[in-house]
Swiss-Prot record:
Similarity field: Belongs to the heme-copper respiratory oxidase family.
Protein name per UniProt: Cytochrome c oxidase subunit 1
Annotated residues for binding of Cu cation: 243, 292-293
Transmembrane region(s): 18-38, 42-62, 66-86, 100-120, 148-168, 186-206, 222-242, 246-266, 269-289, 306-326, 340-360, 379-399, 402-422, 460-480, 484-504, 520-540
GO terms classed as biological process: electron transport coupled proton transport; mitochondrial electron transport, cytochrome c to oxygen
GO MF assignments: cytochrome-c oxidase activity; heme binding; metal ion binding
Organism: Leishmania tarentolae
GO CC term (a single one): mitochondrial inner membrane
Residues the record lists as binding heme a3: 378
Binding site for O2: 247
Length: 549
């Protein structure tokens, strides 16, 4: 208990970064479980595993989106890796406001708890992660779950703002005089630009959510048409934050990938200044294209042309980054490690998401594909595969700085292959389904879409087996650590017996051996049961398809 209090109340940037990482990975696992239930429901026609409870299906979608965006991807990059490594890379002993750093972590933890509490309160919150009125108004969702979730958005937003203020104060107030801005690494530049974006956009979202709370609890009519309000106002407010949120998530990943390319290539990324300017241009343009999410609300032609054109224009600085990474790979004598495979997979996945985004920037195509699974496949390739694969890349790259273990190239290649195959099995068919107008946010569909929905479930279960493989991999590491520990204790006990004529160390070794061996056996039994569960799901689904079709 003392150790737990010492860790949680620490003001060290490294300890706070590790706490962010642990809680964010836990929240990501919770969000993944929600998505697994969504895919299991969509693998059947009609009454699936949720027994026709469409409200609970919408609650799962809402919780999955909010947790993955606000409680996993944002904190794991800005709170975890940025908190841990930015002071080290910039040569600072700590963040400029250590207690503010600790306060932001606790607010993040409270916000995550409020999101989970909103999932468990009454009938839940089934309004979608975009929180659109009028569905979120008191007439349609009267439970306290909506208030819990909007309070969670406030807490998570304040946590991110405090973290960003702390980062900006650290970079500008603690900078040494002989350090120029161009001497910073690309990861520091990416964190700086992301912090500025957060400070600009998050207060706008907080204001919009506060107006919803006023409509629900204080009888105002900011979004109520009957009282003179405007429904489209909240869409403008939300997407003014929502689209820069994509770059808030991706820019730290861009900086992380650039830093890893520099490390494995033993030289700077090609055209470092162009990489910095491209990130700045992406951030600036990203704040002026929010309405390309709203082409179907009845805009005039000029507004559609402007937002569509600027959306295409964002592809130019993005292409600069992609081509610079590829050029750095081709013209650098780098050693082939598992990090190289991860970076290549990130570039490939992000390229698919960027190309499908160019399709959606066209106004006519976007109107046809709006609210279909094409959009779901696009933003999952950008966020779920681009950002998460980038996080995996940075996490494994920096793992040697946290744990004294060595990862084998063969096992990492298996890990990358499984992740690549499972992710593409899950998300790539969504584009084809979207072309055939497969609707999102609806748990039932015609029988003609059954094959591809079940095929995507196999990709989801392959990712589940990947998580179990990671658990088994760490159990293998622990097993070898146990073996080395027991061998050393056994040698020490023999030394004590021959020189001091006592069997006490041998009894201690035997006791530790039995206790830890029991723990190892229980761990592996649990893993075997999990693998059997995954196999049972595969067998049950295949049997159902065989008799149904």
């Amino acid at each position: 208990m003392f150790w737990l209090c010492l860790v949680c109340l620490s003001v060290s940037h490294k300890m706070i970064g590790l706490c962010y990482l642990l809680v964010a990975i836990l929240s990501g696992f919770v969000g993944y479980v929600y998505s697994l239930f969504i895919r299991l429901e969509l693998s059947l026609i009609g009454c699936g595993i949720l027994f026709g409870d469409y409200q609970f299906y919408n609650v799962l979608i809402t919780s999955h989106g909010l947790i993955m965006v606000f409680a996993f991807i944002m904190p794991v990059m800005m709170g975890g890796l940025v908190n841990y490594f930015i002071p080290v890379m910039a040569g600072f002993p700590d963040m400029v406001f250590p207690r503010l750093n600790n306060m932001s972590f606790w607010m993040y933890l409270a916000g995550f708890g409020c999101v989970v509490n909103g999932f468990l309160t009454e009938e839940g919150m089934g309004v979608g992660w975009t929180l659109y009125p009028t569905l979120i108004c008191i007439d349609f969702h009267s439970s306290l779950a909506c208030d819990f979730v909007m309070f969670a958005v406030h807490l998570l937003g304040i946590s991110s703002i405090l973290n960003s203020i702390n980062l900006l104060g650290t970079l500008f107030c603690c900078r040494r005089k002989f350090f120029s801005f161009l001497s910073w690494s690309l990861f520091i530049w990416a964190a700086l630009i992301t912090a500025i974006l957060l400070i600009i956009t998050l207060p706008v979202l907080a204001g919009g959510v506060t107006l919803i709370l006023c409509d629900r609890n204080f009888n105002t009519s900011f979004y109520d048409v009957v009282g003179g309000g405007d429904l489209i106002l909240f869409q403008h407010i939300f997407w003014f934050f929502g689209h820069p949120e994509v770059y808030i998530i991706l820019l730290p990943v861009f900086g992380l990938i650039s830093t890893i390319v520099e490390v494995i290539g033993f030289r700077c990324v090609f055209s470092t200044v162009a990489m910095i300017y491209s990130m700045i241009l992406i951030a600036i343009l990203g704040m002026f294209v929010w309405a390309h999410h709203m082409f179907v609300v009845g805009m005039d032609v000029d507004s559609r042309a402007y937002f569509g054109g600027v959306s295409i224009l964002i592809g130019l600085p993005t292409c600069v980054k992609l081509f610079n990474w590829i050029y750095s790979f081709l013209y650098t004598d780098m050693i082939i490690t598992f990090e190289v495979y991860f970076v290549i997979m990130f570039i490939f996945m992000f390229l698919i998401g960027a190309v499908t985004g160019l399709f959606l920037s066209n106004v006519g195509i976007d109107i046809m594909l709006h609210d279909t699974y094409f959009v779901v496949g696009h933003f999952h390739y950008v966020l779920s595969l681009g950002a998460v694969v980038g996080f995996f890349t940075g996490f494994i790259h920096f793992l040697a700085k946290w744990l004294p273990i060595e990862l084998y190239l063969f096992w990492m290649f298996y890990f990358i292959s499984t992740l690549f195959i499972g992710s593409n099995m899950l998300f790539f068919p969504m584009h084809s389904l979207g072309m055939y107008a497969f609707p999102r946010r609806i748990s039932d569909y015609p029988v003609s879409f059954l094959f591809w929905s079940s095929f995507m479930l196999y990709g989801m279960l392959l990712l589940a087996s990947l998580i179990l493989f990671l658990c088994a991999l760490f159990c293998v590491f622990l097993f070898w650590d146990y073996c080395l520990f027991f061998v050393s204790l056994f040698v020490f006990s023999l030394y004590c017996f021959f020189y001091f004529s006592t069997w006490l160390p041998c009894v201690m070794v035997l006791y530790l051996l039995l206790v830890d061996f029991a723990h190892i056996v229980l761990d592996y039994l649990f893993l075997i049961l999990c693998f059997c569960f995954v196999f049972f799901i595969f067998f049950w689904q295949s049997l159902f398809l065989f008799f149904y079709i």
